[in-house]
């Protein structure tokens, strides 16, 4: 099972049912459960991480705010943004939390490099940046030695809602997206590249693709 990965493409979903399904999957998984990555686009939502502060919500308007249990501060999810949730048994992979964060950042950096986009991580603010502008946000939670939550990569979306918050708690943080810096507009092309990089980085040998929604996710 250590080298087996199931990739689920969930399409467009509300945030909360997928969040609940992640919890269920993590609570019910055993040492024999293969790792999974869920790829999803969310309907518009602001999510507050565990460190989130109300003052970073400037003007949320008609977009709902959900209190999440991932690490980090407030961010925005919406159509045209690739969200990848990493349901990985870290003990089995012999990875620490910091290792996983570094792997995920490198995964995004390598994905962008395939489109000749130079990007970098920052030691003071998790995520991936292009010319100082944030292109990918990151927030994880670990339970029973297993990770859930993951990354949000801006591909081809309306970035306007980010102006209604201090993204990840940083006032004036500028956001950018793949389609603005010479990359593709097609989110599926970016998904494909991301999974290719993940399989290489984390040494998966068997990859199974599925569009079957998780137990909670199909209620969205």
Curated annotation (Swiss-Prot):
InterPro entries: aa-tRNA-synth_II/BPL/LPL (IPR045864), BPL_LPL_catalytic (IPR004143), Octanoyltransferase (IPR000544), Octanoyltransferase_CS (IPR020605)
CDD domains given in the database record: LipB
Pathway given in the UniProt record: Protein modification; protein lipoylation via endogenous pathway; protein N(6)-(lipoyl)lysine from octanoyl-[acyl-carrier-protein]: step 1/2
GO terms of molecular function: lipoyl(octanoyl) transferase activity
Localization, UniProt: Cytoplasm
Residues at which substrate binds: 70-77, 137-139, 150-152
Site feature location: Lowers pKa of active site Cys: 134
Catalyzed chemical reaction(s): octanoyl-[ACP] + L-lysyl-[protein] = N(6)-octanoyl-L-lysyl-[protein] + holo-[ACP] + H(+)
Miscellaneous: In the reaction, the free carboxyl group of octanoic acid is attached via an amide linkage to the epsilon-amino group of a specific lysine residue of lipoyl domains of lipoate-dependent enzymes.
Name by which UniProt lists this protein: Octanoyltransferase
Organism from which the protein derives: Vibrio campbellii (strain ATCC BAA-1116)
